[in-house]
């Protein structure tokens, strides 16, 4: 699957602020809430989850 410019922007946002990358990919839903909780518990789990969401969808 080739990356588009929006995918690259989402990946950069996911590194800086993981919930923003998830919000741009999936909107306001359960994935965003999960990512916010993971980011509060630790920045790295939030990034891993954001990458998973971005690469899956």
UniProtKB/Swiss-Prot annotation:
Signal sequence annotation: none
Keyword Cell membrane: yes
Membrane topology, from the record: Single-pass membrane protein
Keyword field: Cell membrane, Membrane, Transmembrane, Transmembrane helix
TM annotation in the entry: 34-54
Cystine bridges: none
Superkingdom of origin organism: Eukaryota
A GO CC annotation given for this chain: plasma membrane
Intracellular or extracellular location(s): Cell membrane
Metal-binding in keyword set: no
Chief location: membrane
Family: Belongs to the UPF0057 (PMP3) family.
PANTHER family attached to this UniProt entry: HYDROPHOBIC PROTEIN RCI2 LOW TEMPERATURE AND SALT RESPONSIVE PROTEIN LTI6 -RELATED, PLASMA MEMBRANE PROTEOLIPID 3
Functional note: Plays a role in the regulation of membrane potential. Could mediate a proton leak.
Name of the protein: Plasma membrane proteolipid 3
Taxonomic lineage of the native organism: Eukaryota, Fungi, Dikarya, Ascomycota, Pezizomycotina
Gene name as annotated: pmp3
């Amino acid at each position: 699957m080739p990356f588009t410019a929006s995918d690259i922007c989402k990946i950069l946002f996911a590194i800086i602020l993981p919930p923003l990358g998830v919000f741009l990919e999936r909107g306001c839903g359960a994935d965003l809430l999960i990512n916010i909780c993971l980011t509060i518990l630790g920045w790295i789990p939030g990034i891993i989850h954001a990458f998973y969401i971005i690469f899956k969808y």
